[in-house]
Design a protein with these regions (language model features):
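Short S/T/G/P-rich N-terminal loop/turn motif that feeds into the first structured element of a domain
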Residues: 1-53, 60-66, 70, 93-95
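C-terminal structural segments of small proteins and small subunits
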Residues: 62-90
Length: 95
């Protein structure tokens, strides 16, 4: 089954850092055979508070999604936003 990394941002305080993160994160996604399904874009909050940004990345398997998230490449990218974004990450196995 496929695996998905879902990141829901609660806040972003520095758009320049977000751009820097995006470049580094994209390289890690590509290395681990991921495919962006959702990367920002228009959204409507049908219930609860609206998130400023949501990202969904598909991987060939749940294990590969976890390998991506835990990789040095992605963790280096992830650290770029330390102190500049509050977010929740989940790895989810597909149906």
């Amino acid at each position: 089954m496929k695996g998905y990394v879902v990141c829901v941002y609660k806040s972003i305080s520095n758009e320049e850092k977000l751009k820097e993160y995006a470049v580094k994160a994209r390289a890690a996604v590509e290395k681990y055979n991921g495919k962006f399904l959702i990367r920002g874009g228009r959204s409507t909050s049908n219930e609860g508070n609206k998130s400023p940004r949501t990202v969904v990345i598909e991987f060939p398997s749940y294990d590969e999604a976890n390998n991506f998230y835990n990789s040095k490449e992605y963790q280096d990218a992830h650290s770029v936003l330390d102190g500049y974004a509050e977010r929740q990450h989940q790895t989810i196995e597909g149906a």
